[in-house]
Amino acid sequence: MTYLLALDQGTSSSRSIVFDERGHIVAQAQLELPQIYPQPGWVEHDPLEIWRTQIATARDALAKAGIAANAVRAVGITNQRETTVLWNRKTGQPVHHAIVWQDRRAEPACAQLREQGHAATIQAKTGLLIDAYFSGTKLQWLLDHVPGARDAAEAGELAFGTVDSWLIWQLTGGKRHVTDVSNASRTMLFNVHTNQWDDELLQLLRIPRALMPEVLPSASDFGATDAALLGGPIAIGGVAGDQQSALFGQACFTAGMAKNTYGTGCFMLMHTGSRFQKSENGLLTTSAAQAGQSPEYAMEGSVFVGGAVVQWLRDGLRAISASSEVQALAESVPDSGGVMMVPAFTGLGAPYWKPDARGTITGLTRGTTIAHIARAALESIAYQSAALLAAMSRDAVAAGGAPVSELRVDGGACVNDLLMQFQADLLGIPVVRPAVVETTALGAAYLAGLASGVYASTDELSALWQAERRFTPTLPRSQAEALMARWEHAVAQAVLPG
């Protein structure tokens, strides 16, 4: 039996999963990652803790699987994107905590870039909107605020990387300073047309090129693990940012295929093939995970509050005592009784981009019960995702493509059958849940398997991918469209005047 080891380094935890060559989970291990909040709006991780927890889970997963390093054909890495690490090349020690993707300290630098009129150039080169979310301005902040960092960077003494680069550096004993195209595309410094760091953008943000890692396709030779770490060397063959890895793990390899990850928020990506498509609907264009040399792209949009609305029902309203109870409560009524919830607790993300919107519950009557509110809360996840998919399809059609014909789903909330059926009803297309819902880690394993010859092509991976359940629409389109119109009316009410 051939095995693949996926390292899945996330915002709140580090995980490792051993897969067999059929893509089935053999063993897994997980450790929580401490969050550091130095002041409001700032979020950091200790890079040494990222490394400690990740290597510990890798050892644990191999032990649970009962296999030695020589049974593992290759390692794949997937990671929280945009999080920024800066370290000393000689010592391998970080010069500061990692600045996490949620961190907003670089907002003044982003505002300055917008005011100077750089938005169009940055979007044309990178596919991204100027935002503190991305790595470029985080790295700029580190160079400007860590004593001696800029001089050391210009002297070639420091290395920058997203979390994948940091892990590869540690895994290879400092031999390789590399990243993949999908992670590089989240820095605001990478030209997604040429697949290279962009000198104009590096100069604009005053980033020395000597800092930057080599960029490789997502299925490549990223080096090998130091023999002392896992009991023998293992080739590192696959790397991709978490959302692109999930798209790959869902076997969405061709233009028009899309996936939605239902987590705390929702992340939707649609593959656009070799077509770089600038969104007219507030979506990002990003590099997809690439198995070959040619650039491939995806459109991306995110919903801020997805499964988090269920946590709010539990912790805020105390309507349920455990998240698992929400489906039964919502199913105790035939519909929401006209209640609409817009969970704009932190504004609305794509495709609305209304940061000032606030949450609303409308359509209340004397007959409204907590069950109606629970159902409206659950349905709000589907409404937001439907609005996002409609925006993606509009962009695709405008660029000469076809609208999305089915949506593949993963993430914690995709196990909720009521939500998935309502999602299919709103979209008017099938919603498909895979047999293996750990698609983010699976994508990294697939990429590693391609690079190491376990799989011959993505066609082989498409044949391996299996659906666990297919939800087909049961609602007439006229009814679904009427519901979406009511949703859009509720969204308009969530944006307060003033």
UniProtKB/Swiss-Prot annotation:
| InterPro entries in the record | ATPase_NBD (IPR043129), Carb_kinase_FGGY (IPR000577), Carb_kinase_FGGY_CS (IPR018483), FGGY_C (IPR018485), FGGY_N (IPR018484), Glycerol_kin (IPR005999)
- Residues annotated as binding ATP are 11-13, 264, 307, 311, 412
Please give the superkingdom of this protein's source: Bacteria
Q: In which pathway does it act?
A: Polyol metabolism; glycerol degradation via glycerol kinase pathway; sn-glycerol 3-phosphate from glycerol: step 1/1
Q: Could you list the residue ranges forming a coiled coil in this record?
A: none
Question: Recorded E.C. number(s)?
Answer: 2.7.1.30
- Top-rank EC class of the record's enzyme: transferase
Annotated GO MF terms: ATP binding; glycerol kinase activity
Residues annotated for glycerol binding in this entry: 81-82, 133, 242-243
Enzymatic reactions:
glycerol + ATP = sn-glycerol 3-phosphate + ADP + H(+)
Example GO BP = glycerol-3-phosphate metabolic process
Pfam families reported for this sequence: FGGY_C, FGGY_N
Residue sites binding sn-glycerol 3-phosphate per the record? 11, 81-82, 133, 242
Q: How is its activity regulated?
A: Inhibited by fructose 1,6-bisphosphate (FBP).
Its Gene Ontology cellular component terms are: cytosol
The UniProt keyword set, sorted, is:
ATP-binding, Glycerol metabolism, Kinase, Nucleotide-binding, Transferase
Q: Does the keyword Nucleotide-binding apply?
A: yes
Entry similarity comment:
Belongs to the FGGY kinase family.
Q: What does this protein do?
A: Key enzyme in the regulation of glycerol uptake and metabolism. Catalyzes the phosphorylation of glycerol to yield sn-glycerol 3-phosphate.
Which named protein is this? Glycerol kinase
